Design a protein with these regions (language model features):
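Phosphate/pyrophosphate-binding loops at sites that engage ATP/ADP/AMP, CoA/4′-phosphopantetheine
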Residues: 1-4
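Beta/alpha (TIM)-barrel catalytic core signal, keyed to glycine-rich beta->alpha loops juxtaposed to Asp/Glu
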Residues: 11-200
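Metal-dependent phosphodiesterase/phospholipase catalytic core, i.e.
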Residues: 6-8
């Protein structure tokens, strides 16, 4: 990278490493100026609470950012988002399009070049192909049709503008997918946002 520091270092706690040791490494990077800000990626609730508390009292680097999955089909952490926001901690919504499921591309078929068609990647999408997730995707598709916007645009707008969310992370696999994502500019009318929030609960 040809730099002496990174703006944000997201550390991901590993089960085989004590959390205290992980936070000590992050704190060293923060206090030495090698990381301007420190955050946690995909940590458990207890790890998150411990890290934020230690940072708040100065025992370790302050946690300024957290990354975890958050989307219309995975909104179980909504109360955590609100709590973090009240403490000044930003949230990166990972898997904001649920592995592509929230684009609507799996509604009627499984494209041959998709994650769901791959034996190695199917596990990333499978939870979103039936049951509750499918009903949320259908509701999102109906809302998108009414707004004359792509389904993924509406799903991403809901996450992007959710109170407490700092940014939404998506993982395009191709240049075409990236171009499509860059065209997503929807702003949801309040009634649509409220209905989608109810559906996501």
């Amino acid at each position: 990278l040809d730099t002496d520091y990174v703006d944000v270092w997201l550390v991901e706690p590993r089960p085989e490493v004590p959390l205290e040791e992980t936070l000590e490494a992050a704190t060293l990077a923060y206090r030495s100026g090698r990381a301007r800000y420190v955050g946690l990626s995909r940590s458990s609730h207890w790890q998150l609470a411990e890290a934020v508390t230690r940072g708040a009292v100065g025992v370790s680097a302050p946690i300024t950012l957290v990354e975890f999955p958050f989307s219309l089909v995975d909104a179980a952490c909504a109360s955590t988002v609100a709590e973090l926001a009240s403490r000044g901690v930003g949230v990166l919504a990972a898997s904001a399009l649920a592995g592509g499921a929230l684009t609507g591309k799996y509604r009627h078929t499984t494209p041959a070049d998709s994650r769901a068609a791959s034996p190695h990647l199917r596990h990333m999408v499978e939870p979103y192909l039936s049951g509750f997730a499918r009903s949320v995707i259908e509701a999102t598709h109906r809302a998108a049709s009414g707004l004359d916007r792509p389904t993924g645009d509406v799903a991403l707008a809901w996450v992007r503008d959710y109170p407490g969310i700092s940014s939404a992370l998506v993982g395009p696999r191709t240049a075409r997918q990236l171009d499509t994502l860059l065209e997503y500019t929807a702003t949801l009318p309040a009634p649509i946002r409220e209905v989608l929030s109810e559906v996501a609960q």
